[in-house]
């Protein structure tokens, strides 16, 4: 499902209620169907794929921004570090769910216009298929969710920059960028991998929560959050 396998016997949005009412035999619905006759198992597969795409993309965004920001802050120290960490403190104080709601609401019309004006462009086709609200989510992740990664990388850089091999690299005339790229970040790989992996379920939960509220992935596409919302409606009905 996460890789977009398309071996299912029918589409995720095909309505089959009329065929069932006419007595036609259809492929067995293992999880049953929703009120529109759409197969729940297939929609669950697509929902998992959408959630995994969002989780992995958010983790990559957090990885790039957090590692870059944290390494610069930790390496240069002094006033640079103080200013950059106060920015992190401000971002930490922001209510992330509210910011995501505002960004998703504000970006929706602009993304729709972008899709209309750039037909055929791969990003336009992606957001046309996956829904315009995803752009707002990705922007929110880029603005808010990298701060934890940056703090972890900064702390590791503060320790590593005192090592002898960093002093030797400076003595040989290596630039700050080269020292960070070739000597410091590779030695933070353990922390980077662990933090990135922890970011994936956090992003999936955030997307599911937003879709549950109705401001995430839009119909006819589905996600785990929107499916939970539909299921809650069914539980309340019956």
Q: Where are the regions that the model predicts?
A:
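Transmembrane helix boundary and interhelical loop/hinge segments in multi-pass membrane proteins
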Residues: 156-165
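Gly/Trp-centered helix-boundary motif
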Residues: 1-63, 67, 203, 216, ...
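Non-cytoplasmic
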Residues: 97-102, 106, 110, 138, ...
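Transmembrane alpha-helices
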Residues: 49-65, 158, 177-209
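Alpha-helical membrane-interface segments at transmembrane helix boundaries
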Residues: 38-53, 81-92, 185, 189, ...
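Generic hydrophobic transmembrane alpha-helix motif, especially the helices
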Residues: 30, 34, 51, 57, ...
